[in-house]
Amino acid sequence: MYDWLNALPKAELHLHLEGSLEPELLFALAERNKIALPWSDVETLRKAYAFNNLQEFLDLYYQGADVLRTSQDFYDLTWAYLLRCKEQNVIHTEPFFDPQTHTDRGVPFEVVLNGIASALKDGEQQLGITSGLILSFLRHLSEEEAQKTLDQALPFRDAFVAVGLDSSEMGHPPSKFQRVFDRARSEGFLTVAHAGEEGPPEYIWEALDLLKIQRIDHGVRAFEDERLMQRIIDEQIPLTVCPLSNTKLCVFDHMSQHNILQMLERGVKVTVNSDDPAYFGGYVTENFHALHTDLGMTQDQARRLAQNSLDARLVKP
């Protein structure tokens, strides 16, 4: 079944480029940039990937991102991810990047963007993988900081298609970012947001009504609110669900408890994605395979999930 799932044409709509930084590349970039790491080798770092919640993961994620310093580093990171896409027949990807993770430690915005954008361009020309880049604001920082990031991004507006919202969800509701999202929309950007991963269904309502998002990233807690479920079904609002991430971060204790297939059968436009694959133990095919192994996903369900991902693209073919 793995090979069949791997060959299925699919899109990936929820992937953080910084979260695809594999330990081997992390060590190579640290050496290139002469950065001392707190881990002695790749295996020690892999063992550190045993987190219990979103915050523990984020602490490690930001520490790892510190090795990314030059445009070449960001190119190499993005290119390594695109090669994985090619291996897994991901024909279109809409990755997130978190400029604030880098600008806050002194890496200029254009250094980050130039490396990523040139890799995505080469990915289309050399690998045939189309893409649309999403700039994501960090929700644990202030809206004022997000506004500054949007200011930095506007001269490069052609390089990305949408803005998003990620990082620590609890205590940082979408309403905190209403004005910057209003402004981004007025500048012509589409909008998406992480909501309903650890946060309550109310955060999904806010993301829809206040941020006016086109797509919900995660959204698994919508299942707790029947009125919200009905709206998502009626309006066919896509959810970019990340099964391995959800179990690794204890949103669900075990994959057998995941609600993605129940949502699919209810008529929700759910999609399968890898989120931060270097940290969560798998890329898109591994996520599909886990649904087959632990939830008994059928080939018909896999086809529908893959088609949903192609239908839910912000960048239409």
Curated annotation (Swiss-Prot):
The keyword Metal-binding applies. The record marks 218 as: Important for catalytic activity. Zn(2+) binds at residues 14, 16, 194, 275. CDD domains: ADA. Pfam families: A_deaminase. SUPFAM superfamilies: Metallo-dependent hydrolases (SSF51556). Its cofactor is Zn(2+). GO terms for cellular component: cytosol. Signal peptide: none annotated. It catalyses: adenine + H2O + H(+) = hypoxanthine + NH4(+). Binds 1 zinc ion per subunit. One of its GO terms (molecular function) is zinc ion binding. One of its GO terms (biological process) is nucleotide metabolic process. It comes from the Bacteria. Belongs to the metallo-dependent hydrolases superfamily. Adenosine and AMP deaminases family. Adenine deaminase type 2 subfamily. This is Adenine deaminase. It comes from Pseudomonas fluorescens (strain ATCC BAA-477 / NRRL B-23932 / Pf-5). The lineage of its organism: Bacteria, Pseudomonadati, Pseudomonadota, Gammaproteobacteria, Pseudomonadales.
